[in-house]
Amino acid sequence: MFGSGRRVKKWQFIQIFATCFVLSLMFFWGPIDNHIVSHMKSYSYRYLINSYDFVNDSLSLKRSEDGTPRYQYLINHEEKCQAQDVLLLLFVKTAPENYNRRSAIRNTWGNEKYVQSQLNANIKTLFVLGTPSDPLMRERLQRRLVWEDHMYSDIIQQDFVDSFYNLTLKFLLQFKWANSFCPHAKFLMTADDDIFIHMPNLIEYLQSLEQMGVQDFWIGRVHHGAPPVRDKSSKYYVSYDMYQWPAYPDYTAGAAYVISGDVATKVYEASQTLNSSLYIDDVFMGLCANKIGLVPQSHAFFSGEGKTPYHPCIYEKMMTSHGHVEDLQDLWKDATDPKVKMISKGFFGQIYCRIIKIVLLCKLTYLDTYPCRAAFA
């Protein structure tokens, strides 16, 4: 009798536990499906998505539809790279109110005169933006932008509202401008205004690629088989009407990537045939690239949305690091110090930096920075 009572209680416990488990699963299934199952689905589909034309066909404009949106230039510099040998056309995506960020970039990695005199290369830096989104601040900010451009002549602005949901319009602005006014640039780079670019390392790299005559080149931090976010509370939410497939084509993080000049032309042409309502600009770049059969290459020292550790052994080969606003000028001073190159000189210097990079980059827990393989590059 006593044993029978224990069996009943045990069975009741199992029933209660099973009920709680099912209820919990029902409650959390949405997030689980969005974050885990969707990643599994998307990675399974990525080869199909990358290989077939039906994705592009579903997003292509119909013949009866008008082309991409047309916006007027409010500020423009058609002459910026006219009749010049331009190694790199550098677009910086910025917001109208981010004057301090633009100022810091002009004094560091975006400084054309520094690159010309110290690195023997010709780059053209342009800040791309729309109109101020706050109606109360719009007139004052616009006057300030006009004054700023009068001082520096490096702003390109069209009359769409500058917001997260218009990032693809900013993408179209960059490629339209490049195609119209600087088609001869050897490379094109697009970057956020809170990124750090190690310009000496990047220029050395691009000059070597130029000598090789590379084409069909697209490099950055690659996202493979990323799924659309279906959580309506996320700012990255994408509806099935906007994009119906379980995975995006491979693409590079929009924080910073580089393409060759021939790719810039092809991407612009592809962008004119696709529906630009998908507002995530780096994904839209992936769709354009998929249409022309271009595959992105991953570079260990492009951080994507990640932030790199602060250490001279990291600076030696770094290309980009994300999330630098307040410390940008200090990092520029430290990372471009000629002494950095001396740390890894010789056998013991190489061993020392190898150990440092393994400790900083090869951790068991996920770290959004350079991959572990960068420690051995």
Curated annotation (Swiss-Prot):
Transmembrane segments: 12-32
Location in or out of the cell: Golgi apparatus membrane
Catalytic activity: a beta-D-Gal-(1->4)-beta-D-Glc-(1<->1)-Cer(d18:1(4E)) + UDP-N-acetyl-alpha-D-glucosamine = a beta-D-GlcNAc-(1->3)-beta-D-Gal-(1->4)-beta-D-Glc-(1<->1)-Cer(d18:1(4E)) + UDP + H(+); a neolactoside nLc4Cer(d18:1(4E)) + UDP-N-acetyl-alpha-D-glucosamine = a neolactoside IV(3)-beta-GlcNAc-nLc4Cer(d18:1(4E)) + UDP + H(+)
GO CC annotation: Golgi membrane
Pathway stated in the Swiss-Prot or TrEMBL entry: Protein modification; protein glycosylation
Single Gene Ontology BP annotation: lipid metabolic process
Residue spans, topological domain Cytoplasmic: 1-11
Pfam families: Galactosyl_T (PF01762)
Glycosylation sites: 56, 166
Membrane topology category: Single-pass type II membrane protein
UniProt-recorded Gene Ontology molecular function terms: glycosyltransferase activity; lactosylceramide 1,3-N-acetyl-beta-D-glucosaminyltransferase activity
InterPro entries for this protein: Glyco_trans_31
Main location: Golgi
Membrane-side (Lumenal) residue stretches: 33-377
Family annotation (PANTHER family): BETA-1,3-N-ACETYLGLUCOSAMINYLTRANSFERASE, LACTOSYLCERAMIDE 1,3-N-ACETYL-BETA-D-GLUCOSAMINYLTRANSFERASE
Family: Belongs to the glycosyltransferase 31 family.
Biological role stated in the UniProt entry: Beta-1,3-N-acetylglucosaminyltransferase that plays a key role in the synthesis of lacto- or neolacto-series carbohydrate chains on glycolipids, notably by participating in biosynthesis of HNK-1 and Lewis X carbohydrate structures. Has strong activity toward lactosylceramide (LacCer) and neolactotetraosylceramide (nLc(4)Cer; paragloboside), resulting in the synthesis of Lc(3)Cer and neolactopentaosylceramide (nLc(5)Cer), respectively. Probably plays a central role in regulating neolacto-series glycolipid synthesis during embryonic development.
Name by which UniProt lists this protein: Lactosylceramide 1,3-N-acetyl-beta-D-glucosaminyltransferase
The species this protein was found in: Sus scrofa
Gene: B3GNT5
